[in-house]
């Protein structure tokens, strides 16, 4: 495993795994577009997921598009996606709570000035 796949953020893995789970025949370009990450990051992420045993990659047979792949999360991959989803939600909830405190404080400050 190279260094780039080691340092990817768990949210990247979650987003990629979620898209693959929903759309197994999704292209790397479409993953990049929908997850708002670079095509290179998608490639490294897919490689890392495969090395962890969370993802299987199959080439479409008899497809005129020779670069078409089918992605499948392994049972361990589905489990890890669920685990990452819990962590993602927990982190986003904390971000929301912090932002709400900031908004409330700023609103109070502005209200008191007027």
Say what each PLM segment does:
Residues 3-13, 27, 58-81:
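Short, cationic-aromatic polyanion-contact patches
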Residues 13-21:
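Hydrophobic residues on short alpha-helical segments
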Residues 29, 40:
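Key DNA-contact positions within bacterial/archaeal DNA-binding proteins
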Residues 33, 50-51:
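Alpha-helical residues within the helix-turn-helix
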Residues 80-114:
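Amphipathic alpha-helical dimerization/coiled-coil segments
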């Amino acid at each position: 495993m190279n260094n780039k796949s080691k340092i990817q953020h768990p949210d990247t893995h979650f987003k990629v795994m979620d898209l693959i789970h929903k759309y197994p025949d999704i292209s790397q370009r479409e993953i990049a577009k929908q997850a708002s990450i670079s095509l290179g990051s998608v490639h490294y992420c897919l490689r890392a997921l495969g090395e962890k045993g969370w993802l299987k990659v199959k080439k479409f047979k008899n497809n005129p598009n020779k670069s078409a792949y089918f992605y499948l999360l392994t049972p361990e991959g589905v489990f890890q996606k669920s685990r990452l989803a819990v962590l993602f939600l927990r982190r986003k909830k904390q971000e929301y709570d912090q932002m709400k405190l900031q908004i409330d404080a700023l609103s109070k400050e502005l209200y008191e000035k007027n």
